[in-house]
Amino acid sequence: MTKSMNFFQNIIKPFKRSSNRGLEDDIERIAAMEQKVFPFQVLVSATKDFHPTHKLGEGGFGPVFKGRLPDGRDIAVKKLSQVSRQGKNEFVNEAKLLAKVQHRNVVNLWGYCTHGDDKLLVYEYVVNESLDKVLFKSNRKSEIDWKQRFEIITGIARGLLYLHEDAPNCIIHRDIKAGNILLDEKWVPKIADFGMARLYQEDVTHVNTRVAGTNGYMAPEYVMHGVLSVKADVFSFGVLVLELVSGQKNSSFSMRHPDQTLLEWAFKLYKKGRTMEILDQDIAASADPDQVKLCVQIGLLCVQGDPHQRPSMRRVSLLLSRKPGHLEEPDHPGVPGSRYRRRTQRPSGAASLGTLSTTGSSTDSFGSNLNTNTGTGVRGTPASSKASTRSNATRSAGQSSSSDPHGKRHMSY
């Protein structure tokens, strides 16, 4: 009997009371934690009443605060902005769904909280900075040598494969970029900011919610035609791979070289047999030439203009995990404004979103820093036609919402 009591006391120890509340209250709180529900006062206490000194940054979906739970675990608490128009029940249902997404290379959502008009998400706290804070800083990029970069590429591929094919719902991220990749204490990459579009209703414009993605990473069919599929994430991944290999940011490269993008530059060198010139020279000494060439080829295949010509993340993961045999040659990369033969059948799991509005890269981070860049907004449809556009987008999305790469799960955007 004593052992049983000690076991029970150990369970409730993290919830030790500061006042004489009933034992039933503690049991209810334990049960709530099992269901990933965090009491508001626990989060208030953990973040010191959301004190400015605990603020990690401000992302497109609201501020993020660092906190510490009574059991000693560090957390990142995202307070969703009031732009979210979802009711409590809808928010809870979506949060429960996202909380089921568990993978080594995806930032884990530990739970959620609703309090009045406040809606909060509780994530694991990732110690190191986002990838862009390391990769694009001249005094820091050498901290991640080629071996680490290759492992980061492989980890991101596995995380995306999970979101696309193995998660409870097929999740299209829509904003894969260096700022949304967090690195833990062992430099293991974790995809952040996934599934956030599900927490916002369709009647909120893309400009306000920043769910359309980030300039320089978006697939051309998504930018120009509003066609969204898992292949849009594949394109963004390809851009990120080329950035990791070269140590250069696509958007910054275009500013220095107005006549071409990082993708076009890499493609030209690849076709000339000068692939190793693409490599970041700061890490050349640690690089494996065969791995570099493989990553460049995979990156270029992922950024093909025709989404049907891009590999799936499953194939990418397989190519990275073993020495490939024959790997097809990539064509010229796709960029917004480029042309490809549009097929009558959309890519698997594609949904038309109508006319898109694109924004810059304000990032929601759950680690030690937050990246908040601003890009150029592209105005969407006139106000008079927005309603019909949303209606068409909703119908189109609904027609494909039950399909995914395996045709088994609902799609999440």
Swiss-Prot record:
Modified-residue entries (Phosphothreonine), positions: T214
Feature: compositional bias, Low complexity: 348-368
Keyword ATP-binding among record annotations: yes
Region feature Disordered, mapped onto this chain: 321-413
Active site: D175 (proton acceptor)
Reactions listed under catalytic activity: L-seryl-[protein] + ATP = O-phospho-L-seryl-[protein] + ADP + H(+); L-threonyl-[protein] + ATP = O-phospho-L-threonyl-[protein] + ADP + H(+)
EC number, UniProt record: 2.7.11.1
InterPro entries: CR_Ser/Thr_kinase, Kinase-like_dom_sf, Prot_kinase_dom, Ser-Thr/Tyr_kinase_cat_dom, Ser/Thr_kinase_AS
Keywords: ATP-binding, Kinase, Nucleotide-binding, Phosphoprotein, Serine/threonine-protein kinase, Transferase
Residues with the Phosphotyrosine modification: Y123, Y222
Gene3D superfamilies: Phosphorylase Kinase, domain 1, Transferase(Phosphotransferase) domain 1
Similarity field: Belongs to the protein kinase superfamily. Ser/Thr protein kinase family. CRK subfamily.
Protein name in UniProt: Cysteine-rich receptor-like protein kinase 43
Gene (name only): CRK43
